[in-house]
Amino acid sequence: IMADQLRWDHLSCAGHPYLRTPHIDSLARAGVIASRFYAASTTCMSSRATLMTGRLPSLHGVVHNGVNLSHDHTTFVELLRAAGYATALIGKSHLQAFGYDGPLRRRWQNENGGVAPPEGLGDARKRSRAGAGYNNEWTPDWRSGTRQSVETPYYGFDHVELATLHGDQVHGDYARWLAERHPAPDSLRGRDHAIPDSRYSAPQAWRTRLPEALYPSTWVGERGADWLAAHARQAPDQPFFL
């Protein structure tokens, strides 16, 4: 089990005074708590690429958010798939850029009479990590309807139901699920529709009007359980990685 965006101290087994995480606590009691375990990077995509490849950012090249993980790198999910595992990804991946900006999109502009490098020499690596095969998580394509699904196998995952972005701005496959459950989901999402709350001061944070039953995490739990149930019916003896 690898938890995404979870502070180490936001577990009751780590001493949090309010939060209760009984299931994770039971795993901790039966296993090992690593108190000096460090992420490979401070940025999201860099750490995810390290988890997938077992390599440091200096080797896999994802040194910043907005840099796609190259398909040239072997992932542990590909190895599991090759060994006969059923593989599925439901939720956030962020192995490819999904925002509206980033190093691969925000290119250097020559000014004051400078000369830009010729095409093909603008990056340290000649083989591009953009274009075909690298737009699976690009949210503008999901919003416009240009993209309806992820190209599989996706870094080793045969079944993919994707979530992009964060909070109540999540898109991808989740957005279709949300639209099936509310006639006007955008009326509940975003800062303009947030519940007023003076406790929120960070510009990227607000109290969402989206009810818990429609949270992205609710979708992940529902669809994850559905996939597990289907797998148990269809291939009960096949190992899996979700």
Question: Could you tell me what each predicted segment is?
Answer:
Residues 1-242:
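Formylglycine-dependent sulfatase
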